[in-house]
């Protein structure tokens, strides 16, 4: 079955003061630091951040989800739904720490190798090498010599490949052979 390609695939980038949505077509998700979550579209990313803000009493204004007037508390603060980072009841640093603590479980792992790797899968009767580069499965071969020929990389980020391959590649349960 062919894996889906999503032209609207996005994630949250938390590099500056305010989270921002970035798209896989514009940013290399396999190498960009400080990316959180994989979302099918902007609406899904915004819904997740709003839910997180509601659960953790984070300020919509500081998150960029609604406009914030300078020197005035947000409307949610008056309702007790915001801890008050917008008006000084909570420090902006404490707000950022709470946001990062919650977002950390969604953090994307950057591709940790310099180039492609071959994941060795050994069975009783055969050995196969799965060639992977930037979280993209390029194919399976019977020898490391053949694996070197499979290093051509198509453009884009494959969210299915990332979700499927991240755990086995990082677990240490399988021998890995750098190819590049």
Regions found by a protein language model. Give the residues of each.
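Conserved catalytic/ligand-binding micro-motifs in nucleotide and anionic cofactor chemistry
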Residues: 1-180
